[in-house]
Design a protein with these regions (language model features):
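Short, hydrophobic beta-strand segments that form beta-sheet elements in well-ordered domains
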Residues: 29-33, 94-97, 138-141
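Phosphate-coordination loops involved in phosphoryl transfer and adenosine-cofactor binding
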Residues: 2-4, 91, 135
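Rossmann-like NAD(P)(H) cofactor-binding subdomain of soluble oxidoreductases
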Residues: 36, 45-46, 50-130
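NAD(P)-dependent dehydrogenase/reductase Rossmann-like domain
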Residues: 251, 265-269, 274-298
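Interdomain hinge/lid region at the active-site interface
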Residues: 217-275
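Internal alpha-helical scaffold of NAD(P)-dependent oxidoreductase catalytic cores
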Residues: 42-45, 109, 113, 130-221
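Hydrophobic Val/Ile/Leu positions in short beta-strands of Rossmann-like dinucleotide-binding domains
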Residues: 5-7, 67, 140
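NAD(P)+-binding Rossmann beta1-loop-alpha1 motif at the extreme N-terminus of oxidoreductases
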Residues: 1-57
Length: 298
């Protein structure tokens, strides 16, 4: 298989994948971005590739074209690539790295005989350091020839390629959002509440990161039900009500999230979800708006 790549898009994911692939023997021929400056910066980061502004025929020199742009821009990029490449796309492999979109968003290049697939590494990219991808899941779906190349790329990076049904991509992506971005929001809300309790930012962050790591270790070793702790797991609904009242007074904007996550805990962690949810429904309700209007004295 010809290990030549054109990178369309200079975002965090595309840059990181290209650099890692370059280090593992793939030839990065082209790095395309919206502007010359961005393309040059990306090529410098990758340490390979001819920087190009916009989509051009130069990308057609590669056997595989990797589209790594915001989800909404993928069809536009595919259409432009189809316009420029036409019949020269026949037999090419075109991949995109979106977690939510299916390979079908690349239909414009499929129409000219290219093979398309989506390949999403389940990993966060901060744009500063290059994340290690060994042992990370790569969710892949699409045309068989493109899937084979995507699986080869994943294995080159030490990743674990897994097949996913196209129609399940949004659910797969939502699962990642649950475990990453939403957990981060809960962590930061907890830090803010600890700071309001009198801890410094450093103390609050250290306390909750230590707690969260321990919970995740227990989750991995013991499973969800045995790892579950806190007043709700013990059926201590008086403490849950006191928590809600404290949040309503101090951070009313967090109250609905606390209540929603409590219900979610009942659904997915409790041995008897109906009983837990019933108790939660019978707790005294605290209105975030009322608490805010009374200046936190509700």
């Amino acid at each position: 298989m010809l290990k030549t790549l054109a990178i369309l898009g200079a975002g965090r994911v595309g840059r990181a994948l290209a650099r890692l692939l370059h280090e593992r023997g793939w030839r990065i021929l082209v790095v395309a971005a919206r502007s010359d400056a961005t393309a040059r910066k990306a090529a410098k980061y990758i340490r390979a590739g001819q920087p190009i502004a916009g989509i051009s025929h130069h990308a057609l020199a590669a056997r595989t074209i990797l589209v790594s742009v915001p989800d909404d821009a993928i069809p536009e990029i595919a259409a432009e690539l189809a316009r420029i490449g036409g019949q020269q796309l026949r037999g090419k492999i075109v991949l995109h790295t979106s977690g939510a979109c299916e390979a079908s968003v690349l239909q414009a290049v499929r129409a000219f005989g290219a093979f398309a697939a989506s390949m999403h590494p389940l990993q966060t990219f901060n744009g500063v350091s290059v994340p290690p991808l060994e042992g990370k899941i790569f969710a892949i779906e699409g045309d068989a020839p493109a899937v084979r190349v995507a699986r080869s790329i994943a294995r080159s990076l030490g990743g674990i390629p897994v097949n996913i049904a196209a129609e399940k991509k949004p659910l797969y992506h939502a699962a990642g959002a649950f475990a990453a971005g939403l957990v981060l929001a809960l962590e930061e809300a907890g830090v803010q509440m600890l700071k309001a309790s009198g801890l410094s930012h450093r103390e609050a962050l250290h306390a909750l990161l230590s707690l969260s790591r321990q919970v995740l270790e227990h989750y991995e070793k013991l499973g969800p039900h045995k790892a579950w702790t806190g007043p709700l797991s013990r059926g201590d609904y008086g403490v849950v009500a006191a928590n809600e009242e404290a949040i309503a007074r101090s951070h009313p904007e967090f109250l609905e999230a606390y209540q929603a996550v409590s219900r979610l805990s009942g659904h997915v962690l409790a041995a008897d979800p109906a009983a837990v949810l019933g108790h939660l429904e019978n707790l005294p309700r605290h209105s975030p708006l009322l608490s805010k209007s009374k200046g936190g004295s509700a």
